[in-house]
Amino acid sequence: QHDVEAAIELLLDAGSLRELASFDLPPRSWLFPLQGVMPWKYLGAGVYFYLDGQDRAIVPTTDNSLLVIQVPEDPAVETFTLVREYDLSRHVKTLPWPKLDSVAWVMPEWPAAGQDVARYWYATIEGLVGVVDARSGDITTWKSGDEIIENSFAVGEEGIFMMTDQALYRLNVDGSDNHNDKIIVDWRQAYDRGPAAKAGHITRGSGTSVTLVGSATDGLVAITDNAAPRIHLELYRRSNGEKVCSVPLFKDNESGTRMAIEDANAK
C-alpha cells in the first residue's frame, strides 16, 4: 500500500505483478491542486522515465532533479541504488504562488557510435527545455515564449523533436563553444491548435507524443493537431519540417487523442 500523493519507482514481477523492489521518489506537491492540476493531469513524478543500456532508470522528479537509479539484478538480495543525481531546480523558472513548474520528461541524446550518452534532454510542463551534460552536470536551457508542453518528445540522430501546445520543433545543441552549449532551433512548424482543449486533453493543443518514421535523411515526423471539428494526422519531413500531408480523423466534434501514433504493426 502506498500513499496517493507518493511517487515510487517499482520493480514488478512480469507474471504476477508482485512488487519486488521499490524506491521512494519526492512526492507530488499539494500546490498543484491549488492551480487546478489534479493528480490525473499531473505529468511529473517520474511517469516519463526510461531505462538505459546499463539497466538504470533515468527519472525526472517533482522537486526538479534527474535521478540515475540502478535497477537490481537480483531483487531477492539487492534493491534500487541511486547512482547519480542532477539538480535542475536552479534551471526551472520560479512562478507566482501557488503555481509550480516541474520537470516531467527526460530522454537521452542520440549517442555517438561506441560511446555512452553525452547529454540528457529534459522538458518541464511550462515549456522549458534543458540539456544536461552527463559527465559534468552542466545545464543549458531554452524556452519558446508562452508555449507549454503536454507530451513527450522523440530523439533522432539529427536532433530532438519536441512539440508544444502550438508548434512542432527540431532542436539541437551547438557545442562549438567548449565551455557553453547552446540549444538551437533547426526548424519550427506551427499546427492548428483549435479553439479549446478537447475532452481528454490537458492543454489547448495536440494530445499526441511525437513519432519518428524512417531515417534522418528521408524520414517523417507524425503528430496529430487539435483542429476543429476534426483532428488531423499530419506528417512532416524530418530534414526540414516541410508538411507532407494532413488527413482528417474520426467524426466531427468526436475526435481527440492522448496517445502516440503507431502503424499497423504497433511501431
Annotate the PLM regions:
Residues 1-43, 65-267:
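Extracytoplasmic/lumenal domain signature
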Residues 24, 50, 58-60:
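Short, conserved beta-strand segments within well-ordered enzyme catalytic domains
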Residues 46-52:
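N-terminal membrane-targeting/anchoring modules of bacterial envelope and secretion proteins
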Residues 55-58, 62-68:
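Acidic, Gly/Ser/Thr-rich repeat motifs that build Ca2+-stabilized beta-propeller blades
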